[in-house]
Amino acid sequence: MGRFIFVSFGLLVVFLSLSGTGADFFCPSGWGSNNGHCYQAFNQRMTWEDAERFCSAQAKGGHLVSIETRAEADFVAHVVAERIETSFPHVWIGLRDEGKEQQCSSEWSDGSSVSYENWIEAESKTCLGLELDSNYHKWVNVYCGQRNPFVCEA
């Protein structure tokens, strides 16, 4: 009986120590995690729509990245700086003009509300990308058919 309790206790300790690894365990292989979300930057050059479809196919709940806070913007800029070749001036994010009175859609491609904004310019908005010149912190208008690298979030 004592041996059974000892083994059971040992298994409980192992389980509890592993349960703290959380987010990385559930992220697809090679993806980074932050605050319960998984992120991956891809160097493939695609149009905004193709990149969105690609992200959806990569992971359950995958979309182009939705940047909802300054802290998340900093994390995404870090991921991009580490993984995207610096020869690309723009990197797709999950926001674009949906043709609603020449204003940007009020939601990200994953359906979440736009609660944080960081525009470089406030002109007509088409598709949005992060700009190299701002170290991938500022958003810039980009023609949706342009082929750019992108960041997926799941």
Swiss-Prot record:
InterPro entries (UniProt xref):
C-type_lectin-like (IPR001304), C-type_lectin-like/link_sf (IPR016186), C-type_lectin/snaclec_domain (IPR050111), C-type_lectin_CS (IPR018378), CTDL_fold (IPR016187)
What is the role of this chain?
Answer: Inhibits thrombin-induced fibrinogen clotting and factor Xa-induced prothrombin activation. Binds to thrombin and prothrombin exosites.
**Keywords of this protein's UniProt record, alphabetized?**
Blood coagulation cascade inhibiting toxin, Disulfide bond, Hemostasis impairing toxin, Metal-binding, Secreted, Signal, Toxin
Sorted alphabetically, which PROSITE patterns does this protein's record hold?
C_TYPE_LECTIN_1 (PS00615), C_TYPE_LECTIN_2 (PS50041)
SUBUNIT field:
Heterodimer of subunits A and B; disulfide-linked.
Q: Name one Pfam family in it.
A: Lectin_C
Q: Indicate yes or no for the key word NADP.
A: no
Q: Where is the C-type lectin domain?
A: 34-153
The molecular function terms in GO held by this entry are: metal ion binding; toxin activity
Q: Which residues bind Ca(2+)?
A: 66, 68, 72, 153
Species the sequence originates in: Gloydius brevicauda (Korean slamosa snake)
Which protein family is named in the record?
Belongs to the snaclec family.
Q: Which SMART domains match?
A: CLECT
**What is this protein's record name?**
Snaclec salmorin subunit A
Q: Which residues form the signal peptide?
A: 1-23
Q: In which tissues is it expressed?
A: Expressed by the venom gland.
Q: Where in the cell is it found?
A: Secreted
- Entries under PANTHER family matching the protein: MANNOSE, PHOSPHOLIPASE, LECTIN RECEPTOR RELATED (PTHR22803)
The cysteines covalently paired via disulfide bonds are 27-38, 55-152, 127-144
Q: Which SUPFAM superfamilies match?
A: C-type lectin-like
